[in-house]
Amino acid sequence: MCIRDRESGVFSHKTSDGRQMKKSVTMKDHTETFQMVTAALTDPKAGVVKDLSEISAIGHRVAQGGAIFHNSVLVNDEVLEGIESLIPLAPLHNGPELDGIRACQQVFGPDVPQCVVFDTSFHSTMPPKAYMYAIPYEYYEKYQIRRYGFHGTSHRYVSKHCAHLMPVSYTHLTLPTTY
């Protein structure tokens, strides 16, 4: 895990032998940060892979998929543009997440597929009566103000796990979940 505030940060990870490593570091951008991650992954003494060629795909969690993304998608230029267009809806999340995706592209190149999972996609089947606010409709059209629902990856996991435990078909399950 990397926590960064401007250029100073903390890099924390668990080694292949279970040791917890934590150190203060300088990280000027997402690419430099991701290079630290890959160095830890491939460290000869404590890494979990011999080299980066063992990594066959990369997954990203992005907070806001808006009305554009209803499912997980493979990263391409159109997806990057879509995520960028949604930065105003999640300025603290989508911008840095987009930087992370681009950093992975720089480090791994175009041959390693990347997938994006959107927190809002779980809730994307809400009908308009559930996601519309009692505000002028033009605000919805102009500013995309509506209920999106967040933490969908957690809600999906909880509801699928409950369906498995009950056992009930997930597709026929109506279940309140809280976060």
Language model regions located:
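Catalytic cores of large soluble enzymes that bind and process phosphate-bearing ligands
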Residues: V25-D29, T33, N71-V75, L89-P96, ...
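Phosphate-binding/catalytic loop of phosphoryl-transfer enzymes
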Residues: N94-L173
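Single conserved hydrophobic/aromatic residue that forms the stacking wall/gate
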Residues: M1-I3, H172-Y179
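Short glycine/proline- and acidic residue-enriched helix-loop micro-motifs
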Residues: K22-K23, G82-I87, E141-I145
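N-terminal glycine/serine-rich phosphate-binding loop of ATP-dependent small-molecule kinases
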Residues: M1-F69
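Short beta-strand-loop/turn "lid" adjacent to the catalytic site in phosphate-handling enzymes
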Residues: L41, G47-H93, P113-C115, S121-A130
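Short, low-complexity, polar/charged sequence segments that are solvent-exposed and flexible
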Residues: G18-M21, E32, D77-L80, Y133-Y137
